[in-house]
Amino acid sequence: MEFAGIITEYDPFHNGHAAQIAAAKSAGAGCVAVCMSSGAVQRGGVPVLPESVRVCAALDAGADLVITLPAPYACATAEQFASAGVRLLAALGCDTLVFGAEDPDAAQQIGRAHV
């Protein structure tokens, strides 16, 4: 893993998000890019915190780059949200996607299914 990507909203950014960025770095990512929704979130509303605050939080936590997921994709279905994020990160040369899950067992099952 040289270039890790995270597709997210960070609405709001919390310690779990910081741990995710740190885990990507400790796993060998030389660069971590975050593709983040801007002025709209997937639930169709506006974020709790402005984009500038969420970008600063990601950078302060160790992300090297934050790019914006355009609002039409941020407000779309989960599949379209993720697909647009994957395409943007792939265009930058991202070779690994990093994700989290509220249920650790689900994350392990997903990881095993895609090995």
Task: Annotate each predicted stretch with a short phrase.
Residues M1-H114:
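Nucleotidyltransferase catalytic core that binds NTPs
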